[in-house]
Amino acid sequence: MSKQFDLIVWDWDGTLADSTGMITQAIVSAAAQVGLPSLDPQVASNIIGLGLKESIYVLFGDIPAEKAQALARQYTANYYAGESEIPLFAGAADTIKTLNKRGFKLAVATGKGRRGLNLALEHCGLGNYFHATKTVDECFSKPHPQMLDELMDELVVRPERTLMIGDTSYDLQMAQNANVQAVAVTYGAQSRDKLSGYNSIAMFNQFEDLSTFLLSL
């Protein structure tokens, strides 16, 4: 039986990597460290998936450039202090390896910067299993479709043969903007209620169920 999809594009944080708690703490702490108003962790977690510049604007509006730069530097320092300790969700590595072996093209589209993604791939040992990756250092932040558009062009896959997997509304809106089908996961940054307004073909509460679905494609 022929596959429904040729290309599977993964978000990273909150989809493959169990990193949402650490990211939230890093931005909450950074805001306090540079003298900005305290952040509610739930509010802070809702920006996961955006690029850092866009996240700062959503959280604090049009603050002075020097304050935004100080926050970005402090967040980056906080994040990299614990980055090497961030695990993948249980079963994620095996799922990626199996999908690769079965002939799927695999890619990453993330709000992380290039340095952060490269370090994450190095730490988890999965870099060789992805055919291409895109970050906010090369593309517009989600939900702009540029990451998906460039991945499909680079890997020569049509939108109807591409599947996006993510844990935020930014992932699902990006997929819609690129005319790509999507799967939502609720074990990451955003809840089922937050994600249910998008036309995902499936929604899963734990990685194990997502893996079962993907391995049945």
Q: Which sequence ranges carry the predicted segments?
A:
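Substrate-recognition "cap/lid" segment bordering the active-site pocket of phosphatases
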Residues: 85, 113-164, 169-178, 192-196
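Short glycine/proline-centered loop/turn elements that form peptide/ligand docking sites
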Residues: 26, 93-94, 98, 148, ...
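Glycine-rich phosphate-binding loop signature in dinucleotide/nucleotide-binding domains
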Residues: 2-3, 101-104, 155-161, 217
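Active-site neighborhood of HAD-like aspartate-dependent phosphohydrolases
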Residues: 1-46
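Short acidic-hydrophobic, aromatic-tinged amphipathic segments that line or gate anion-handling sites
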Residues: 202-206
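Short, acidic loop-to-helix structural element flanking the phosphoryl-transfer center
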Residues: 81-108, 114-118, 145
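A metal-dependent, Asp-based hydrolase signature
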Residues: 48-80, 90-93, 97-100
